A protein has these predicted regions:
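A short, Lys/Arg-rich alpha-helix, primarily the initiator
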Residues: 1-21
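Residues in the recognition helix of alpha-helical DNA-binding motifs
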Residues: 14, 28, 39, 69
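The alpha-helix within a helix-turn-helix
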Residues: 15, 26, 56
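Short alpha-helical DNA-recognition segment
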Residues: 19-38
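The DNA-recognition helices of helix-turn-helix-type DNA-binding domains
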Residues: 32, 43, 70-74
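Short, charged recognition helix plus adjacent turn
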Residues: 38, 67-80
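Short, basic-rich loop-to-helix N-cap that marks the start of a DNA-contacting helix
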Residues: 43-54
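Intrinsically disordered, low-complexity basic tails/linkers immediately adjacent to helix-turn-helix/homeobox/MYB/SANT
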Residues: 57-66
Length: 80
């Protein structure tokens, strides 16, 4: 799993836990829905830390809480 895939999965997981849709998350986070949906698109590779921070603010969690899960602990090495 790539970092981008892990971020997407974590966003979906957090939305499910809080019973909110991606569109709602975008609105409460102050980002456009298209930004959130593009982060979910498997074809897109880049993820902005600033956008992740805004989404965390909308979810009322810290970046540490967001990244503190098994998804990120088991990522493969990015440098080949």
């Amino acid at each position: 799993m790539s970092v981008k895939d892990a971020v997407s999965a974590r966003i979906r997981e957090m939305c499910a836990e809080k019973s909110i849709k991606l569109n709602e998350l975008a609105n409460i986070s102050g980002v456009t829905p298209s930004t959130v949906y593009s982060m979910m698109d498997a074809r897109r590779r880049d993820v902005s830390v600033i956008t992740v921070k805004k989404l965390c603010d909308g979810l009322q969690i810290s970046l540490g809480e967001f990244f503190s899960c098994d998804l990120f602990d088991s990522l493969e090495q990015e440098i080949e």
